[in-house]
């Protein structure tokens, strides 16, 4: 493995974004300001009161964006009164220009929690997945243009202050979720109850209207569940502007993720959208969707194997064509959440730690060239002035993979005064724990680390200064 700090190859991309934000109760003052509601300040509160928020842990991870899809499944976010268009604007026959016809209360509260975590909301316009026997919010709207006008006013509420709203920084607005799910297998779709042709018409109308209203915002979608046949067919006939194409991939290897990313990028370039961002905004470790392999996958997501998959995928995606990763899911209470326990709320799980580890690189900003020929070895590095960092992971989906020693050559950062390297270890028994430090001299030096499968290291590097 090799890191060349002389060679800056771009910016570190937001690979540590999530679906959904922190669980936090927000107190809003009469002047509109708001802060976390601290249950510990309540007079006569029981001394053993369970922590009921993960705001601090969420903020410490430095999560840059939170997509709000499926937020309405969780009562702490507001449940059936939150985020989804049909929950905010409940009477589709009402006047979409009248603020009284909108119920923003719970969604306001949820978004404030994200703002308190310094996390920008990536807003999914549409509805949560409906696995129920009867579908409601995933049916095609009665009037496509009116639906777009409703969304226009939701955007104005959160970015322009309409209807006693806000001027939050919310750049990404996504139209719908997984319209391709069961699109050609004869099953009833839990995400789009119409035809492919209807969705194409719907998307064209909605995206064109919203981009006309908000040329400065990023309008895109449609959060494709992963069908490349559907993706090509959709992009080949798309008429509307497309600032980003969002898609999903659940897989057991980084290769599967990167192969799909390459196909998406190829279709975008081929069909006239070379500037559109490719955003993978649902992903997690999944070996299969049925049987014992599915159960195994769910078990691993919050364990060290799931954590290593997260770290490896972040590093691989940084080197590839993906512009943003959004892990599914940080929503408490779902079995997809490998980051946070539900009780106590602030307890973090193994898959949490790659997020603050990657954030160390993200804060440095400048991605530098890395080379790896080590099977199962993943590496990503960044620098800014006299500071640098390296994220290193050993991930192989085969649980029987033997431990290795990884040798890393680091070029272009140190000098005769020395570079101090701090080591932080994530494995079965360490949670991004400080594991020692060493000083290395010269413009080029090597580090060798023992790397059992599913191990990650964060190396924080600083130039030593003469007194």
Where do the PLM segments sit?
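Mature N-terminal, pre-catalytic/accessory segment of carbohydrate-active enzymes
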Residues: 1-57, 61, 465-467
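Short, acidic/polar
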Residues: 5, 43-58, 153, 157, ...
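Conserved, mostly hydrophobic/aromatic
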Residues: 18, 114, 154, 173, ...
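Substrate-binding cleft and catalytic face of glycoside hydrolase catalytic domains
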Residues: 61-252
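Noncatalytic carbohydrate-binding groove/subsite architecture in carbohydrate-active enzymes
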Residues: 195-310, 320-322
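Aromatic/acidic polysaccharide-binding cleft in carbohydrate-active enzymes
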Residues: 284-386, 395-398
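Carbohydrate-binding surface patches
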Residues: 374-417, 453-460, 466
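Acidic, Ser/Thr/Pro-rich beta/coil linker or hinge segments at domain junctions
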Residues: 405-453
């Amino acid at each position: 493995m090799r890191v060349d700090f002389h060679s800056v190859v771009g910016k570190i991309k937001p690979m540590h974004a999530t679906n959904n934000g922190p669980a936090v109760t927000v107190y809003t003052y009469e002047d509109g300001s708001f802060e976390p509601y601290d249950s510990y300040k309540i007079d006569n509160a029981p001394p053993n009161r369970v922590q009921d928020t993960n705001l601090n842990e969420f903020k410490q991870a430095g999560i840059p964006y939170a997509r709000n899809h499926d937020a309405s499944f969780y009562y702490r976010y507001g449940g059936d009164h939150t985020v989804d268009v049909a929950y905010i604007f409940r009477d589709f026959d009402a006047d979409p220009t009248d603020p009284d016809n909108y119920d923003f209360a719970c969604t306001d509260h949820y978004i404030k929690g994200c703002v308190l975590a310094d996390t920008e909301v990536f807003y999914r316009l549409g509805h949560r997945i409906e696995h129920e026997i009867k579908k409601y919010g995933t049916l095609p709207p009665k009037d496509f243009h009116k639906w777009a006008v409703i969304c226009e006013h939701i955007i104005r509420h959160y970015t322009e202050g309409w209807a006693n709203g806000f001027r939050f920084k919310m750049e990404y607005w996504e139209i719908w979720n997984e319209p391709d799910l069961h699109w050609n297998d004869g099953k009833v779709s839990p995400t789009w109850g119409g035809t492919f042709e209807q969705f194409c018409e719907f998307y064209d109308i909605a995206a064109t209207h919203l981009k006309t209203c908000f040329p400065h915002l990023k309008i895109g979608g449609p959060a494709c569940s992963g069908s490349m046949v559907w993706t090509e067919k959709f992009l080949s006939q798309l008429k509307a502007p497309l600032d980003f194409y969002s898609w999903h991939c659940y897989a057991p290897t980084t290769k599967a993720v990167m192969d799909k990313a390459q196909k998406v990028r190829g279709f975008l370039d081929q069909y006239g959208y070379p500037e559109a961002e490719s955003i993978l905004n649902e992903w997690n470790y999944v070996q299969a969707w049925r049987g014992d392999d599915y159960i195994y996958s769910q078990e691993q997501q919050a364990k060290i194997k799931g954590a290593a998959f997260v770290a490896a995928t972040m590093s691989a995606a940084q080197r590839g064509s993906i512009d943003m990763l959004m892990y599914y899911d940080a929503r408490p209470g779902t079995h997809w959440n490998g980051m946070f326990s539900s009780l106590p709320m602030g307890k973090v799980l193994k898959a949490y730690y790659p997020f603050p580890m990657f954030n160390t690189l993200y804060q440095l900003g400048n991605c530098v060239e890395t080379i790896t020929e080590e099977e199962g070895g993943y590496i990503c590095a960044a620098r800014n002035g006299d500071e640098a960092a390296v994220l290193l992971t050993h991930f192989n989906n085969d649980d029987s993979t033997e431990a290795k020693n990884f040798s890393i050559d680091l070029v272009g950062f140190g000098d005769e005064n020395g570079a101090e390297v701090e080591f932080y270890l994530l494995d079965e028994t360490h949670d991004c724990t400080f594991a020692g430090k060493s000083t290395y001299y010269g413009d080029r030096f090597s580090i060798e680390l023992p790397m059992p499968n599913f191990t990650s290291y964060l190396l924080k590097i600083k130039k030593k200064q003469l007194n």
